[in-house]
Regions:
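N-terminal cap/lid segment of alpha/beta-hydrolase-fold proteins
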Residues: 82-134
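The serine-hydrolase catalytic nucleophile loop
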Residues: 149-162, 179
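Short beta-strand element of the alpha/beta-hydrolase
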Residues: 135-144
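Alpha/beta-hydrolase active-site loop
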Residues: 190-211
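Central antiparallel beta-sheet cores of small beta-barrel/beta-sandwich binding domains
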Residues: 1-66, 87
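Conserved alpha/beta-hydrolase
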Residues: 162-184
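Active-site nucleophile loop of the alpha/beta-hydrolase fold
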Residues: 242-252
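Alpha/beta-hydrolase fold nucleophile elbow
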Residues: 212-223
Length: 255
């Protein structure tokens, strides 16, 4: 069993160096090589106010990582860390998965005015339980803050895929989709707001209703997705809401 912090340095094709700290959700942090001669390496990460210094010994670089007055040993070697995720569903699957896409037209249906975030196509996966029949319930999954794929993959864990598998085996269909600018979804991720994310989810609900295949339609939202679930319920767009770690206080009390 591995305990600790995974840190990876990458030398890019243009000679620049970046650092990833996947356990902290940080990737592509620019690093400056301050010293590279014979067996000595020194790298500075100004954004983190951190520095790494090490010496080559055999197949490893033995060194020290320092940040804001704290230091600890950090040894580097070539390789790939494979994390065991036994909960990730594996084929064969006892249900059907269909690639779908739906559109947020970026226009208010009542006023005709542009909406926040603008137009986007959202690519996703619609999962049907075995022996699916019209009128079965369906759940649309809404991710938390930040742009994530349809599985809401975080550090190699795919919670939305796990939940979709669980629900499909219990007779509930699901729709999960890539956030704007991720995977097969279009749109400008720099213009994303909670409102635009809500409208994307609403477009997903409208798509599900347009198929005329499902009965009750619910929203399962994680973190910020829980807020979006409440927003959609308040508008009368969903039949039920499941909030995973969604706030229950006013925003000005949460922050």
């Amino acid at each position: 069993e591995f305990y600790g912090l995974i840190v990876a340095y990458t030398v890019n094709a243009d000679g620049t160096v970046t650092m990833d700290s996947p356990d902290q959700g940080a990737t592509g942090l620019p690093a400056e090589v301050k010293c590279l001669q014979e067996d000595t390496l020194s790298i500075e990460l100004s954004q983190l106010r951190a520095q790494y210094t090490g010496k080559l010994k055999g197949e490893e670089i033995l060194g020290t990582f320092s940040q804001m007055g704290y230091s600890f040993p950090l040894n580097l070697k070539r390789g790939e860390v494979k994390v065991n995720r036994p909960q990730t569903p594996q084929p064969p699957f006892d249900y059907t998965m269909q690639e779908v896409a739906f559109q947020n037209k970026g226009v208010d249906g009542k006023t005709g005015l542009p909406t926040e975030g603008g137009e986007a196509w959202l690519g996703g996966t619609l999962t049907y339980p075995k022996n699916f029949k019209a009128g079965m319930p369906v759940v649309i999954m809404v991710s938390g803050s930040g742009q994530q794929d349809r599985d809401e993959e975080i550090l190699g864990h795919k919670p939305f895929l796990v939940i979709a598998d669980y629900l499909a085996r219990r007779g509930i269909a699901t729709l999960r989709y890539d956030d704007r600018g991720v995977g097969k979804s279009t749109g400008d991720p720099t213009k994303v707001t909670i409102q635009s994310n809500m409208l994307d989810a609403q477009a997903g609900i409208d798509y599900l209703r347009s198929t005329k295949k499902f009965g009750k339609i619910g929203v399962l939202g994680h973190s910020e997705g829980g807020i979006i679930g409440y927003m959609l319920a308040a508008k009368g767009k969903s039949d039920f809401v499941v909030s995973l770690a969604g706030p229950v206080l006013r925003g000005d009390s949460v922050l």
